From Swiss-Prot:
Lineage: Bacteria, Pseudomonadati, Pseudomonadota, Gammaproteobacteria, Enterobacterales
Stretches that traverse the bilayer: 5-25, 52-72, 105-125, 138-158, 163-183, 208-228, 236-256, 273-293
Chief place where the protein resides: membrane
Membrane topology, record value: Multi-pass membrane protein
Protein name as annotated: Uncharacterized protein YnbB
Key words, A-Z: Cell membrane, Membrane, Transferase, Transmembrane, Transmembrane helix
InterPro entries registered for this protein in UniProt: PC_trans
Entry keyword Magnesium: no
A single GO molecular function term of this UniProt record: transferase activity, transferring phosphorus-containing groups
Gene that this polypeptide is encoded by: ynbB
Length: 298
């Protein structure tokens, strides 16, 4: 099933590439440079992800740890506070807890270490100016890029009935999360009228949100029972939760960027911006979907 699912992703990418080339041929005046760049980046993302998700579990965990590291590093370039380098060691420790299936320690490690060690460490520096801003900014970045994001990796550790079960759960989550972004964008562009958060993200509309959520619920209803142990009702609810939480992750990251005064979080992914621009929705959907499916099925 994993091989067929990945083959479907490649088929969709081929279709998108052909449609884009056809439109560029038929409408030469159309500016399709950004779309072409985005599709090329998607090719790189899907090829890399396919290799990792098809490999051994340690490889997938290492990949997620690398994503957390790059995301945290990118976040550090955005905020105007000094980020202690020793905090980066929390990333391999966090993913080691996942690899050894230490769920209780995982729940405590990042939140408790951030609450106690981070705050105490800043006090020992000796300068209390900007203490609250510094600690909260660092802690929020650590929670987002390491703790929340690593819940996607935890899906690999759930006691599934077959060896590919965890990988299929990750694929299901990522496919719906990214499709949700695309669906909400397309619905918003086609029939969006009422803005949801105009001061944060003017392009987000109520019609785009509702259309995207309904689309993802239908997609989840179709592929959920195939890739996951969810039944029909649970698959619908999973689609609803992913659709709404993905929107929340998107606008929260937009609020952070607006507060800092930047449009994109970086330039790591051509046509997409930074890594945080690509995984902002996943930061929220990963923990929501993990606890939902763990409660419902495990």
């Amino acid at each position: 099933m994993l091989e067929k699912s990945l083959a479907t992703l490649f088929a969709l990418l081929i279709l998108a590439t052909l449609i884009n080339r056809f439109l560029l041929w038929r409408l030469p005046e159309r500016k399709g440079g950004e779309v072409t760049l985005r599709i090329r980046t998607w090719w790189g993302i899907v090829i890399c992800f396919s290799m990792v998700i098809s490999g051994p579990r340690w490889m997938t965990l290492t990949f997620f740890a690398l994503i957390s590291f790059l995301a945290l590093k990118e976040y550090c370039t955005l905020i105007s506070v000094h980020f202690p380098r020793w905090l980066y060691w929390g990333i391999p420790l966090n993913y080691l807890l996942i690899g050894f299936n230490c769920f209780e320690l995982f729940l405590l490690f990042i939140p408790l270490a951030g609450f106690l060690i981070l705050a105490t460490g800043q006090v020992l520096v000796g300068d209390p100016s900007g203490f609250l801003h510094t600690v909260s900014a660092i802690f929020w970045g650590w929670i987002m890029t390491v703790f929340a994001l690593s819940h996607a990796a935890w899906l690999l550790m759930l006691p599934t009935t077959n060896i590919q079960g965890g990988a299929l759960l990750v694929l299901f989550l990522l496919a719906l999360t990214e499709s949700n972004d695309i669906a909400q964008y397309l619905w918003g562009k086609s029939c969006g009228r009422r803005k949801v958060v105009p001061k944060v993200s003017p392009g987000k509309t109520l019609e785009g949100l509702m259309g995207g959520v309904i689309t993802i619920m239908i997609a989840s209803l179709i592929i959920g029972p195939l890739l996951t142990p969810l039944n029909t009702l649970q698959a619908l609810l999973a689609g609803l939760l992913i659709g709404i939480s993905g929107f929340c992750g998107d606008v929260v990251m937009s609020a952070i960027k607006r507060d800092i005064g930047v449009k994109d979080s970086g330039k790591l992914l051509p046509g997409h911006g930074g890594l945080l621009d690509r995984i902002d929705s996943l930061i929220f959907t990963a923990p929501v979907f993990f606890y939902f499916i763990r409660y419902c099925c495990y």
